[in-house]
Every structure is written in structure tokens, then in C-alpha cells.
Amino acid sequence: MTNINRIGLTWISFLSYAFTGALVVVTGMIMGNISNYFHLSISQMSNIFTFLNAGILVSIFINSWLIEIISLKKQLIFSFILTIIAVIGIVLCNSIFLFSINMFILGLVSGITMSIGTFIITHLYSGSKRGSLLLLTDSFFSMSGMIFPIVTAYLLEKKIIWYWSYICIGAIYLLIFLLTINSSFEKFKTNTKNSKETKEKWNFNVFLLSISALLYILGQLGFISWVPQYATEIMNIDIKKTGSLVSGFWMSYMLGMWFFSFIIKFFNLYRMFIFLTSMSTILMYCFIKSENFLNQQYIIISLGFFSSAIYTIIITLASLQTKHPSPKLINLILLFGTIGTFLTFIITSPIVEAKGLYVTLISSNILYGIVFFLSILIYFNKKYERVI
């Protein structure tokens, strides 16, 4: 494989996460504008995230088998066509039902592309290089989540209608399409053939890592989703100031992924997993117990930094459980992570209603604690001793 082709495929992986990040963040940002457009309340618009997440969940689930039937290149080209159809549908639709269908289609595209992006990195690179590039790939989700709100805010400020945000997001997939038609995917055809011929045996750590992915994402989103309301209602902090907590978390999260992508090769991944989950659990507890807003700002920035590499390390460790990680193995972790996202408000909303915001954040902290416990189990249960 030529170096230029490898770079092109790597950028497809980067942009696949950027596409999903922009889609998720922008949809939440313009929900008020969308509800006004369709003359609905904000609560009635909540099904947008349900359809979007359902699309991502379904596509990641079926892509494990789809990849053995349809080549990666054809999937990406077909996904580009679906993106065009969905964006045009969003622009032209005049009912919330049609809008929800188009969001489901974008969710399908997002899930397929993200799983392909992860699969590409795990098969192009190995060892510490794989871990570093998976972290760098994941950082494009956060980077896109920072850039596109600025673009969207500019469009809305200029009185440009909200659906232009989705047209801009579609431009990311145009870049993916251009890279796809100019790249060779022959290496992956051989890999998928080999995975059919040799049955992959998964050890118990694969199950533990899958559960870790679900609990980590559920704990993270359950925490960060309710932090603004917690700071406002429990801490009596001005609503404008609470935004700095969330933005500080995601900024340090992105910087943390960049930092760990460079230093991860010097450490054992199993021990790094234990260290980061323990630090994150302690920092989250300190945030919840703190009664000083300035301290909370420092703590949540530290939390974002130390928790940034956990999910990618889970994916990397899963890929190292077998000699030749299959699409099914990688998609299993992504599937459990997506289930965690899907369950966030389904699980946390009843807790908020019944027990309050404090108990909800404590519940997220407990989930982080369980992931820390699982990281220790995974360390002692590892099948292969690898220093990475």
C-alpha cells in the first residue's frame, strides 16, 4: 500500500468522526429553531435525538455483517448518496415526520461511516501506532463539535435558515466521498476474506470491555448532560456561567486526546486504563462534593482531560484481544458505546424526577467506579501480556 493511499484512508477515518460530531452537536444546538419552524414545543422535538441515535445504533449493529457482503468503498459511496437524499429531504420537508425519517437516514450514514473509520485504523496500523491514531481520530469528534457550533451561530446571527447547518455538515461527507473514489481498498478485501475463513475466538475480556464501553459512555453523558442544571439549581450559579463548565470539559477532553495520542506508546495500555478510570472516578466525586464554583471549574477541566482517552483505550484493547480483529469485534464495542448514548436520558430522566439531580450525578460516579473495577479485572484476566 502506497503512503499516499494510507494517508487518504486515514483522513476518511478522521472525517467519519467529524461528521458524527457535527451532526450530534448541531442538532442539539438548533433544536429551538427547528421547533419554531414546525410550530412544536421543545419537548415534542425530543424524538429527533431518538431517531438520530436509533439510526446510529441500527447501522453499527448491521454493519458487522454488511461489511462481508458490500465492500467498504461501495458502502461509503452509497452513504454519500443517502446523505444527499437526507439533506435535500430536510430542506424540502414540511412535516416533523419526514424530518425524523431524514434524521434516521443521517443516523444510519453516521453509524456506518464511523464503524468503517474505526475498522480502517485498526487494520492499517498496529500496536502503539493504532492506539495513538484511534485517539487522534476520536479527537475529530470533539473538534467538529467545537467548530460547527461557531459556524451555526454565525449562520443564525446572519438570519440564515437553520437547515443550512446540515448542508454544511454534508460538505464533510463530500470530502469523504472525494477521498473514497481516489483511494484503494484492496487491503480490506483480503482482510474480510481472511476473517470469513478463520473463526475468531473472543475471550472474556471482550465481554468486560463491551460492558465498560456501555457504562463509561452512560456515566459520562449522564453526568455532563445534567451538570448545567445541577450548577443552576443546587449550586445557585448563574445560567451563563454554567455553560463554561460544559465547554471547559469538552475543550480539555479534546486536548487530552491529542496529548495521550503522543504519550500512549510509552505506557502499558492495561495500566493506563486503570489509572485513567481511577482518576476520573475520584475527580467526578470531588466535583459533586465541591461547593465552590471556581474549584468545580478546575475539577471538571481535569476530569475532561483524564477521561478523554478511556473510550479509545477500550476500543484499542478490544482490538488487541485477537491477532486479526474483525469488523464484528470493533463494531461490538461501538455498539455497546452507542447503547450507552441511547440509554442516557431513558435512565437518568426518571432518576432526576424521583431522586433529584444530586443522586443522578452520584449514579454517574458509581458507573465510573464500576468501570474502574472492570479495568482491574481486565488487567488480571488479559490473555496476552503485551507492553505497548
Swiss-Prot record:
One of its GO terms (molecular function) is transmembrane transporter activity. It is found in: Cell membrane. GO terms for cellular component: plasma membrane. It is a multi-pass membrane protein. Disulfide bonds: none annotated. Keywords: Cell membrane, Membrane, Transmembrane, Transmembrane helix. The chain crosses the membrane at residues 11-31, 50-70, 77-97, 101-121, 133-153, 160-180, 206-226, 244-264, 268-288, 298-318, 332-352, 360-380. Pfam families: MFS_1 (PF07690). HAMAP family: MFS_TsgA. Belongs to the major facilitator superfamily. TsgA family. NCBIfam families: PRK03699.1. This is Protein TsgA homolog. It comes from Buchnera aphidicola subsp. Acyrthosiphon pisum (strain APS) (Acyrthosiphon pisum symbiotic bacterium).
